[in-house]
């Protein structure tokens, strides 16, 4: 199919030969492209928007041919949630509870512990009793929760189960990751305490039998040799891994002898005095299950937070503990049964998984929340986990492991089981628990059946829709000579899109002002058969229907008229162009603006297009909606502001303008052609006189310019040093030749200099207003000291001789004078007084207001300058960063053309006459002066931050972290040589004001850059398991 623009031209080509009054139904159908050939499938890469008969590429390809049944629904196969044969059951991660899931799976595979828990009886139900069917079972104690969880893990049909009841009973925060080793200790203590109330000794003592061992702290006095023992129980051995490579090295260090000397000497009861001694740990007995905690998470003294040690530790599958025991004649060979892994390089984030051996088959499994993976063969495989946790390329390479040994930098707990030749236990689920499991299995089966039925119904509906769409699409094209309807292409596409159910048909957006189909909307419409249209309107409703009667003859006739006028315009443009080449003699021509001549064709086209748009608005509606009054008024205003033909030579008084460069004479023939298109254009014969009022104003303007130039020259000559800012007096070093100096506003001096530089552009300065420097009581707002320092930029000092000239040239409202009085006999000492005198009350109020403004600000800019190691940080380094040549900057600004000046420096009032500063505007004026004089110029390695006075230093450090990638605990901040250390203090209380420059010195970055992700969590106080059931709350 031809491109869209070609189809547009072809649809209206008949207008070249057919006048508007001769338009027939055949022409109307041509305009609406009814007769275009429909496209065949395979001939179009995409739908032809210019052809309403093209029904290819509208989404039909999805429905033609065979369709996969899964596309008719978005329901996953419920059997994917079913437990596979001989597979273990996973546990849902509730947010950050993966550390809990790993321990639950490990304890579940401790068959002795599982059996003891099954035998545990509760207050409500003795072991062996059934639960009433009409009552939902809700575990009350920790033991009951574990019983129910273990029973589900053993016999559930689900692929994974939800441990939220157990987690909720402990009161754990599911969104906060906790210390897994601490959780293990606290839960074992809680479980032991809970089981101690059981009558059955096998249940009551199961924790001690499985996990409890004994060791003794043995202290030997070096003086008398007396040996003292302190026997203690342990449930795990906490082994330091720093500086070690093998597990046996860690155990050796744990049992290493320690010397007690100096201040740490031991008080010997035999010697009755402090003596040097040795202390060590002796292992007395070991449990059946030996838990070895590898201390991967340690406290970092430099940062004040925990960090993870990514040290590789080697360990074997068989561990002989006999060399470490006090008594050597026992059985102390242990087999590896579980390895608990922490993925990640930070102590505050990451993911926990567990590798646990099945005690019945000897096979290894990886437990990762809902997902459980069986290892190939019967060997433990840790290599993949170590690769996943690779923090950086700089880490130590993984050492080679021999047969039966492993090494890991992510293992934080190793569990060994005492080697035995006895067969493993066969643990059966008690009847009352099995009944609960069966109930849950029944619910799961019901859910699976519901999901399967929903899938089946969705597939059935999809197949019906498939056949329906195939049939309707075959009958969708309208055959030649048959009744037809136009329908929205967008609606058709939504009908073919299964993801969005179609809404009622809405054709209102395609209507013209006459309530029929707009010819320009044909590109978003499609012509379909009446049969399919009837089906659509019956099923989905909507409207209005757009059949053959909806083709708008009025719109087609009007478009025909406008197109013919545009064609005529092209011919007239050529004629006028040739006529303009003819020289006009005498007074037979007409004045036409040059700008109008350049754009008359475009203006005529726009005029024709406006007529086309007016036709759409003719009945007060556009696409069925009445236009907004505000929109109509806005359009009228825009039309008034637009240039109309020949108005570019009309002066403000409605007469011919005086500038002959903006107009030219055209012949009568050319003007007649132009007048056809612009009948209301102003007409000026070539003998027409220019506007007399404009001539008078022109002469007056020239006279004013000459007067202003003369004034500027006179004032510059009289006050030459003031204009050039040369030989100016200074209060800090009072000139010897005079005892009086006068003060004027610096604002006055700047405005006056602008006028002198550009007298034809700027208004003359006729008055000198000093009221801005005085308070409402008429007193001076500045002290002598302040005028030599911070307030010096607000005033200008004037010599007495200059003051005399100023009084002659300008109207002065207030005289401000400073007088020096020398003491008799002491020419070096002098007193300074001002007229008018200082107003202490208002001066104090001004200072308070200034300080308050500096301490109370929002969204102000400060600058952070990062200092590298090789640059010395001086106490006064911060002020140096603010140094900028403000005077040179101002001079450059003055020399710029108007409109290009920096608004921070340009204080002129847009060329208007200077207005006096009132007292109320004094403060804002002063702020402008301060801003101009202390304008900050950013330097390399510096970034601007938006801050408020009430935010804390800690919050500022977080902003700095995002800007410079420096963690808060690595930031050293200084301002004016003072270290900022109180994280809870506000910026206002620390003396940080707008435009301050803070120096940032970063400590050496930690090797683990991923820890940056945990800065927010690091900065929060660590509460551990406070408030949970593990601590008895």
UniProtKB/Swiss-Prot annotation:
Location of this chain's protein in the cell: Cytoplasm; Nucleus
UniProt domain USP: residue ranges: 89-419
UniProt xrefs under PROSITE patterns: DUSP, UBIQUITIN_2, USP_2, USP_3
Keyword flag Transcription regulation: no
Keyword terms, alphabetized: Cytoplasm, Hydrolase, Nucleus, Protease, Repeat, Thiol protease, Ubl conjugation pathway
Source organism superkingdom: Eukaryota
Top-rank EC class of the record's enzyme: hydrolase
InterPro entries in alphabetical order: DUSP-like_sf (IPR035927), Papain-like_cys_pep_sf (IPR038765), Pept_C19_DUSP (IPR006615), Peptidase_C19 (IPR050164), Peptidase_C19_UCH (IPR001394), Ubiquitin-like_dom (IPR000626), Ubiquitin-like_domsf (IPR029071), Ubl_USP48 (IPR044743)
Annotated stretches, region: Disordered: 610-639, 878-920
Domain DUSP: 457-552, 567-690, 710-823
GO biological process: one example: proteolysis
Catalytic reactions of this protein: Thiol-dependent hydrolysis of ester, thioester, amide, peptide and isopeptide bonds formed by the C-terminal Gly of ubiquitin (a 76-residue protein attached to proteins as an intracellular targeting signal)
Main location: cytoplasm
Active site per database record: 98, 351
EC number: 3.4.19.12
GO-annotated molecular function: cysteine-type deubiquitinase activity; cysteine-type endopeptidase activity
Domain Ubiquitin-like: 931-1007
Matches recorded under Pfam families: DUSP, ubiquitin, UCH
GO CC annotations, alphabetized: cytosol; nucleus
Family per similarity comment: Belongs to the peptidase C19 family.
Function text: Recognizes and hydrolyzes the peptide bond at the C-terminal Gly of ubiquitin. Involved in the processing of poly-ubiquitin precursors as well as that of ubiquitinated proteins.
Protein's name in the database: Ubiquitin carboxyl-terminal hydrolase 48
Species of the source: Gallus gallus
């Amino acid at each position: 199919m031809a491109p869209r623009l070609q189809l547009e031209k072809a649809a209206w080509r008949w207008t070249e030969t057919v006048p508007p009054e001769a338009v027939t139904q055949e022409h109307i159908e041509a305009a609406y492209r009814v007769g275009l050939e429909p496209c065949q499938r395979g001939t179009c890469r995409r739908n032809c928007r210019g052809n309403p008969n093209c029904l290819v590429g509208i989404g039909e390809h999805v429905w033609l041919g065979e369709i996969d049944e899964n596309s008719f629904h978005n329901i996953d196969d419920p059997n994917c949630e079913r437990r596979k044969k001989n597979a273990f059951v996973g546990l849902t991660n509730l947010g950050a509870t993966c550390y809990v899931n790993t321990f639950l799976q490990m304890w579940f595979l401790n068959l002795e512990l599982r059996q003891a828990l099954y035998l545990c009886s509760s207050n409500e139900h003795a072991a062996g009793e059934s639960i009433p069917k009409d009552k939902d079972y809700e575990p009350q104690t920790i033991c009951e929760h574990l019983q129910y969880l273990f029973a589900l893990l053993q016999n559930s049909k689900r692929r994974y189960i939800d441990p939220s009841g157990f987690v909720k009973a402990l009161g754990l925060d599911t969104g906060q990751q906790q210390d897994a080793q601490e959780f293990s200790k606290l839960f074992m203590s809680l479980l032991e305490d809970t089981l101690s109330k059981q009558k059955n000794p096998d249940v009551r003592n199961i924790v001690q039998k499985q996990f409890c061992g004994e060791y003794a702290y043995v202290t030997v006095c070096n003086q008398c040799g007396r040996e003292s023992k302190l026997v203690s129980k342990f449930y795990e051995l906490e082994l330091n891994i720093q500086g070690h490579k093998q597990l046996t090295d860690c155990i050796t260090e744990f049992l290493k002898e320690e010397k007690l000397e100096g201040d740490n000497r031991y008080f010997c009861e035999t010697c009755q005095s402090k003596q040097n001694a040795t202390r060590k740990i002796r292992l007395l007995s070991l449990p059946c299950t030996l838990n070895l905690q590898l201390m991967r998470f340690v406290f970092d003294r430099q940062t004040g937070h925990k960090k993870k040690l990514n040290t590789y530790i080697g360990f074997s599958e068989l561990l002989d503990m006999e060399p470490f025991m006090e008594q050597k004649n026992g059985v102390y060979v242990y087999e590896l049964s579980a390895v608990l892994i922490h993925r990640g390089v930070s102590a505050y984030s990451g993911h926990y998984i567990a590798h646990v051996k099945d005690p019945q088959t000897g096979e290894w499994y990886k437990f990762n929340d809902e997902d459980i993976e069986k290892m190939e063969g019967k060997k433990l495989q840790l290599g993949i986990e170590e690769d996943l946790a690779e923090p950086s390329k700089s880490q130590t390479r993984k050492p080679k492991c021999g047969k039966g040994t492993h090494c890991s930098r992510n293992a934080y707990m190793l569990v060994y089981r005492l080697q035995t030749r006895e067969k493993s236990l066969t643990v059966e689920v008690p009847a009352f628990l099995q009944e609960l499991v069966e109930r849950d299995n029944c619910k799961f089966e019901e859910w699976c059946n519901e999901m399967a039925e929903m899938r089946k119904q969705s597939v059935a509906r999809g197949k019906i829709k498939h056949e329906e769409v195939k049939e309707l699409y075959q009958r969708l094209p309208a055959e030649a000579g048959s009744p037809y309807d136009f329908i929205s292409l967008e609606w058709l596409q939504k009908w073919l899109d299964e993801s969005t159910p179609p809404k009622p048909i809405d054709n209102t957006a395609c209507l013209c002002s006459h309530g029929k189909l707009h010819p320009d909307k044909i590109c978003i419409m499609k012509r379909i058969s009446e049969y399919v249209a009837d089906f659509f309107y019956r099923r989905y409703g909507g409207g209005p229907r757009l059949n053959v009667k909806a083709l708008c003859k009025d719109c087609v006739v009007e478009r025909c008229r406008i197109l013919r006028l545009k064609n005529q315009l092209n011919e007239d443009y050529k004629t006028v162009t040739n006529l303009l080449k003819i020289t006009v003699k005498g007074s037979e021509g007409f004045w036409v603006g040059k700008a109008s001549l350049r754009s008359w064709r475009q203006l005529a086209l726009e005029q024709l297009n406006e007529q086309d748009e007016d036709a759409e608005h003719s009945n007060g509606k556009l696409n069925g909606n009445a236009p907004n009054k505000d929109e109509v008024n806005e359009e009228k205003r825009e039309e008034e502001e637009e240039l109309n033909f020949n108005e570019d030579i009309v002066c403000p008084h409605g007469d011919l303008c005086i500038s002959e460069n903006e107009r030219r004479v055209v012949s009568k023939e050319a003007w007649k052609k132009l007048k056809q298109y612009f009948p209301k254009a102003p007409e000026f014969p070539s003998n027409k006189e220019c506007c007399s009022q404009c001539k008078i104003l022109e002469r007056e303007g020239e006279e004013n310019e000459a007067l202003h130039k003369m004034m500027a020259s006179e004032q510059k000559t009289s006050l030459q040093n003031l204009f050039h800012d040369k030989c100016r007096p200074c209060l800090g070093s009072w000139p010897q030749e005079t005892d009086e100096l006068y003060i004027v506003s610096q604002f006055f001096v700047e405005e006056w200099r602008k006028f002198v530089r550009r007298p034809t552009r700027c208004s003359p300065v006729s008055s000198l207003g000093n009221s801005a420097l005085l308070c409402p009581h008429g007193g001076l707002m500045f002290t002598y000291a302040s005028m030599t320092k911070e307030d010096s930029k607000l005033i200008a000092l004037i010599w007495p001789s200059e003051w005399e000239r100023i009084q002659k040239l300008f109207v002065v409202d207030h005289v401000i004078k400073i007088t020096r009085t020398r003491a008799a006999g002491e020419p070096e000492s002098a007193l300074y007084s001002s007229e008018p005198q200082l107003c202490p009350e208002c001066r104090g109020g001004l200072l308070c207001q200034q300080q308050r403004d500096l301490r109370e600000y929002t969204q102000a800019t400060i600058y952070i300058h990062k200092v590298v190691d090789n640059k010395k940080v001086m106490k006064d380094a911060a002020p140096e960063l603010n140094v900028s040549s403000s005077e040179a900057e101002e001079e450059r600004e003055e020399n710029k053309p108007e409109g290009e000046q920096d608004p921070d420096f340009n204080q002129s009032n847009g060329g208007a006459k200077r207005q006096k500063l009132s007292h109320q505007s004094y403060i804002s004026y002063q702020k402008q002066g301060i801003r101009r004089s202390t304008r900050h110029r950013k330097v390399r390695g510096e970034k601007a931050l938006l801050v408020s006075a009430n935010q804390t230093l800690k919050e500022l450090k977080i902003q700095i972290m995002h800007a410079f990638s420096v963690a808060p605990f690595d930031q050293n901040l200084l301002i004016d040589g003072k270290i900022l250390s109180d994280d809870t203090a506000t910026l206002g209380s620390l003396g940080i004001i707008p435009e301050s420059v803070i120096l940032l010195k970063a400590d050496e970055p930690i090797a683990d850059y991923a820890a940056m992700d945990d800065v927010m969590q690091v900065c929060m106080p660590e509460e551990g398991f406070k408030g949970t059931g593990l601590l008895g709350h």
